[in-house]
Amino acid sequence: MNDQQEIPTVQGLVRTEPIQQRSAQRIEMLLDAAAEIIHVSGIDSLTTSDVATRSGSSVGVVYRYFPNIQSLLRALAARNLEHYTDRVFAALENDQHAWRNALDAAIDTFVDMYRNHVGFRALRFGDVINDRFLDPTLSNNGVFARAIAGILGEKYGFAPTDDLVFELEVIVEIEDALMKRAFLLEPHGDERFIEKAREIARSYLRDSANLPDVS
């Protein structure tokens, strides 16, 4: 996998890099406030002044780290991705199954975040705003596929290849469409589409993909 394609992080997206823990905590408060607002009212209602008020900060503090709402949302999308990858890796920590079954944990975590993670449904990983929201050189699903490849490689002890990233991106594109449909009409998600997503991921990894031969 191309080592130069790094996964976007909150720290890399803020205007002023947090040096002290207090600054990092303030950024978390701003992102928490933004997530709470879009969870209730959607992305279009988000304003700098509302984020400042809800977080107990001044507008100047918001601008210190985020020059505009777009940059704040980009950082929130990156944090969603960080939370997602952390949770998937934790779910796989004691898993003894072959790595080709690991996408069950990835799908289950995505579903749980859709249902329970504040603000995730409104923003996801930023693709609801722009298909290249996290990185202008990659599609959002491309960034997502690289994150999954990194998790699998670290957990199961192999170096992700470009072929693996491509195959995972194909799966992500398919799964993304099914997940959008699952939550389009059902707030809790239509289990038929969710189960079909699991089934397709397992089948693709087992039968179709040119992937590393590891256990």
Please describe what each predicted stretch is.
Residues 90-94, 123-132:
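Short linear capping/connector segments at secondary-structure termini
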Residues 79-102:
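Amphipathic alpha-helical linker/stalk segments
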